[in-house]
Amino acid sequence: MLPDAVKKAGYLTVASDVPYPPFEFYDTDGKTILGSDPDIAKALGELMGIQFRLQPVAQVNIIPGLSSGKYDLGLSGMADRKEREAAVTFVDYMRNAGTFLVTADAKHHPMTLPDICGLNVAVQSATTMADDATGQATKCTADGKQAPKVMEFQSQDDAVLALRSNRADVAMVTAGSGAFIMTQAKGQFDMTATYSAGSILGIPVRKDNMQLAKALEAGVQKLIDNGTYKKILTKWGLDKLNSIEKSGINGAIS
């Protein structure tokens, strides 16, 4: 099902927002990329008989890089959203929800988006969480409340660092990431609540490359059906919060 050019080349160039644990992050050597997305890429490569070559790319640069032809696809826990579907085609492969991460001794414990009014909020740029925070800032002002100070960072690690260093009252991250961060931080953080019903996560490809999208959709579904997908997500603590039963194309909820 792969395009002939991909078969001939023997590889696909994959943009991935490293670090974004547990989806992708560096091992202790600072070079090897670990996580659920690299494992999925490896499994897809073995299934298709080609290499998936991951390249670290900031989230904000993934879609522009795809559109320019610099990368063949993105694999980075990216939300499939209607507005993004105007620029790329998504192959849906997971789901996720937003959550609030606070320090264990936090004074504020937001449970819903209106609870962030007046707080210092750390988010990663170009993410659904960043959009949610800035959108809520407008609503806070409209309701006569103090808007949150939204602090945007290039990486999720930097947003969490702002929380750890008390520059932020709360960090807004995905539920899968929040759960992983808590296991690694050993009591430093708490997740107060998931604040959204969740979104579909997709593998973006160029709009004009539907043949590749169809091949990836079939590949993801094969991994789901043969149990490889469940093993990978379970390994990274994502099975309960992030798994789906059926892949698809452009399945954005909003």
Language model regions located:
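Bilobed "Venus flytrap"/periplasmic-binding protein-like clamshell domains
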Residues: 21, 33-46, 78, 97-155, ...
